[in-house]
């Protein structure tokens, strides 16, 4: 899931062990409830897909791209799908297609890697709004995907350095 994150952020997650330990310790009870709620809603999406008569297969299938292992959410009617629960703000990005311009969690890159491993050109997100229960489908065409192998090579190259990669943003706030 790190494939969509900036190289600098990934570099620090591997090279700053004190920060990693601190982040792990900062999860609270409510954080774990939010994670659980997200997993439950994603299971509801799978259930609803099956109940509506769709064929859901290859759930949590292990995939390998450029020696990196991942697990896809599944296939719905032979289309690669990632099930997501989202806040109303994030849900709107999937519904309107703005996710292709503003993807802070790297969802497109992750789905691109799964698509590359499956050798498919089309995929999509089935997303539920955690607040309203609204559901949308956001198709992802291969022209919107990244080359996952090249991206992994870029990450590896940056991790080999003892110096963090350059910032992908201005050091001076706007």
PLM features per residue range, with description:
Residues 83-84, 126:
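Beta-strand residues in well-ordered beta-sheet regions across diverse protein folds
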Residues 101-103, 113, 117-174:
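Metal-dependent nuclease catalytic regions and adjoining charged, substrate-binding loops involved
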């Amino acid at each position: 899931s790190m494939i969509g994150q900036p190289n600098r952020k990934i570099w620090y997650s591997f090279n700053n062990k004190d920060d990693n330990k601190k982040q792990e310790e900062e999860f609270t009870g409510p954080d774990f409830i939010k994670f659980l709620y997200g997993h439950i809603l994603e299971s509801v999406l799978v259930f609803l897909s099956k109940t509506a008569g769709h064929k859901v297969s290859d759930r949590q299938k292990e995939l390998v791209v450029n020696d990196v292992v991942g697990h896809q959410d599944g296939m719905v009617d032979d289309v690669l799908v990632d099930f997501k629960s989202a806040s109303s703000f994030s849900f709107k990005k999937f519904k309107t297609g703005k996710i292709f311009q503003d993807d802070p969690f790297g969802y497109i890159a992750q789905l691109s890697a799964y698509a590359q491993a499956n050798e498919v050109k089309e995929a999509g997100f089935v997303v539920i709004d955690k607040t309203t229960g609204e559901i949308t489908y956001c198709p992802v065409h291969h022209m919107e995907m990244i080359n996952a192998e090249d991206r992994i090579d870029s990450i590896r190259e940056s991790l080999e350095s003892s110096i963090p990669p350059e910032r992908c943003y201005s050091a001076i706030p706007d």
